[in-house]
């Protein structure tokens, strides 16, 4: 059974996450894909790997996804990246980071490089999709 936590960001915004706290050790930070959540096999597999290998772990559901508050349609890469930055600063702190991003989560991982470049010791992109908007949505946007 996985114990989920919530970080209250504002009176109306909370972010659901899983953590395995370890001091002075690298953290795996798993970031899920578009319209996904923490209920799947990947977050659990990486959490179990972290526990077996004496590593810290953090995974979160971006606002509007999973059981985090908010509406999905109000989210975007920038907002979800900010959710991620906030949780990393709160949970991982100054520990080293190994990012694992699944699909869109790889894109959000890459966005974190500018904030945590001195802490990053690894990055794994699984089915990375940094250009998925072009095929799915770009042609539907207005010229404005």
Q: Predicted regions span which residues?
A:
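Catalytic nucleophile-loop/oxyanion-hole region of alpha/beta-hydrolase
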Residues: 65-91
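N-terminal cap/lid segment of alpha/beta-hydrolase-fold proteins
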Residues: 1-23
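Short beta-strand immediately N-terminal to the catalytic nucleophile in serine-hydrolase-like folds
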Residues: 99-101, 126
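Gly/Ala-rich beta-loop-alpha elbow adjacent to hydrolase catalytic centers
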Residues: 101-109
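Conserved alpha/beta-hydrolase
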Residues: 43, 47-69
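Short beta-strand element of the alpha/beta-hydrolase
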Residues: 25-33
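The alpha/beta-hydrolase serine catalytic core
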Residues: 11, 107, 119-144
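Short substrate-entry loop that stabilizes the transition state in hydrolases
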Residues: 35-41
């Amino acid at each position: 059974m996985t114990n989920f936590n919530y970080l209250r960001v504002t009176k109306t915004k909370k972010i659901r996450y899983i953590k395995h706290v370890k001091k002075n050790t690298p953290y795996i930070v798993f970031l899920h894909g578009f319209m996904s959540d923490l209920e799947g096999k990947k977050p659990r597999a990486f959490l179990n790997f972290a526990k077996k290998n004496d590593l810290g772990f953090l995974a979160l559901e971006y606002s509007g996804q999973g059981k985090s508050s908010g509406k999905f349609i109000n989210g975007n890469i920038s907002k979800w990246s900010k959710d991620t930055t906030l949780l990393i600063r709160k949970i991982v702190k100054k520990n080293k980071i190994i990012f694992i991003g699944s699909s869109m989560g790889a894109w959000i991982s890459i966005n974190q490089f500018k904030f945590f470049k001195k802490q990053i010791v690894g990055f794994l992109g699984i089915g990375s999709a940094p250009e998925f908007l072009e095929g799915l949505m770009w042609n539907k946007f207005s010229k404005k």
